[in-house]
């Protein structure tokens, strides 16, 4: 994936799309670290496990349930991988500075497309998960292993909490995507 340097409020900030899924995202992060990157704010969208979370609502990930394989190559087995507290604090401070409502969230990281079954959604909700995505646990694990600062900001996208999937038009929410990108840049500058 191409990497870009973006001028954000007079400061150069790196930008790269890590792809979809834990293995590829981890590889992109490894390459960025090899190039000297030490502070990362990841941003994007994720599915919600509770339809009461409005599309576009922001979620600061504090940790992720490890239901993928990549993270286990970086950290000993455990149920969760955590975001770096400094990155979480930078994200929360950024959002609060703008008066933007948000939730501190646990994500469910899966590597299986189309397998957010009702039973799995119930299980993950019982574990405290508010959203599902495909990279966070692996990225948190790589960051811990490589001793860098990494956090993640998501906007609430599709809803997988019911018997039928509800896209909620999340792929067309360009304003939400632009918002999380700008907020991620700002939070990164706080690190």
Where are these regions (language model features)?
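Zn-dependent metallopeptidase/amidohydrolase metal-coordination segment
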Residues: 137-172
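Short acidic/polar active-site loop segments enriched in Thr and Asp
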Residues: 38-39, 130, 149
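Metabolite-binding pocket within alpha/beta catalytic cores that recognizes anionic/polar moieties
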Residues: 1-90
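Short glycine/serine/threonine-rich phosphate/pyrophosphate-binding segments
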Residues: 23-26, 134-139
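His/Asp/Glu-rich mid-to-C-terminal helical/loop segments that flank catalytic regions of hydrolases
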Residues: 160-191
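Active-site rim beta-loop-alpha module in soluble metabolic enzymes
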Residues: 78-126
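Generic non-transmembrane alpha-helical segments
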Residues: 90-98, 142, 183-191
């Amino acid at each position: 994936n191409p990497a870009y340097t973006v001028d954000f409020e007079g400061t150069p900030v790196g930008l790269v799309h890590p792809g979809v899924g834990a293995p590829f995202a981890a590889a992109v992060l490894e390459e960025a670290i090899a190039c000297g990157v030490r502070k990362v704010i990841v941003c994007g969208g994720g599915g919600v496990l509770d339809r009461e979370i409005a599309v576009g609502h922001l979620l600061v990930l504090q940790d992720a349930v490890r239901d993928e394989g990549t993270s286990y190559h970086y950290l000993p087995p455990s149920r969760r991988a955590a975001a770096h507290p400094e990155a979480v604090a930078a994200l929360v401070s950024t959002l609060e500075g703008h008066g933007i409502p948000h939730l501190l969230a646990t994500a469910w990281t899966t590597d299986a497309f189309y397998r957010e079954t009702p039973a799995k959604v119930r299980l993950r909700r019982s574990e405290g998960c508010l959203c599902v995505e495909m990279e966070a646990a692996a990225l948190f694990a790589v960051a811990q292993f490589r001793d860098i600062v990494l956090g993640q900001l998501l906007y609430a996208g599709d809803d997988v909490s019911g018997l039928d999937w509800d896209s909620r038009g999340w792929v067309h929410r360009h304003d939400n995507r632009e918002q999380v990108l700008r907020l991620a840049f700002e939070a990164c500058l706080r690190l």
